[in-house]
Amino acid sequence: MYQGKKVVVVLPAYRAALTLEQTYKEIPFDLVDDVVLVDDKSPDNTVQVARDLGIRHIVMHKKNTGYGGNQKSCYDKAKELNADIVVMLHPDYQYTPKLLASMITLI
């Protein structure tokens, strides 16, 4: 929660099994209320890693919809969770989730 606003991090995932744990563990949970992972029919064990990490909101596509389709599913689920602030974080560790605190406080 940030200034009374519900913060949801969305993770559009594809083949993220090897990087998801590192990404997830750096999320600033003092500001983030929920995490959503949308798996775009990954051929690896991304979903199992997400479950093992305790991610509660996992959406699994039955077919690969591409990056745009994955983003849409992320935002749809965040809306369903009544998010006030949605931050998209790539679970392949392109950048550190430690930057989220700076991003959220700018909103």
Tell where the protein language model's regions lie, with residue ranges.
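Acidic metal-phosphate-binding loop of nucleotide-sugar-dependent transferases
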Residues: 65, 93-94
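Short beta-strand-to-loop acidic/aromatic patch adjacent to the donor-nucleotide binding site
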Residues: 83-92
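Conserved donor-nucleotide/metal-binding helix-loop-beta segment in metal-dependent transferases, i.e.
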Residues: 98-107
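Short, well-formed alpha-helical segments that are part of the catalytic scaffolds
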Residues: 14-29
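A conserved acidic beta->alpha catalytic loop
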Residues: 39-47
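Cell-envelope/extracellular polymer assembly enzymes that use nucleotide-activated donors
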Residues: 6-8
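Donor nucleotide-sugar binding loop of glycosyltransferases
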Residues: 16-19, 42, 96
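Conserved donor nucleotide-binding strand/loop of the catalytic core
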Residues: 33, 47-81
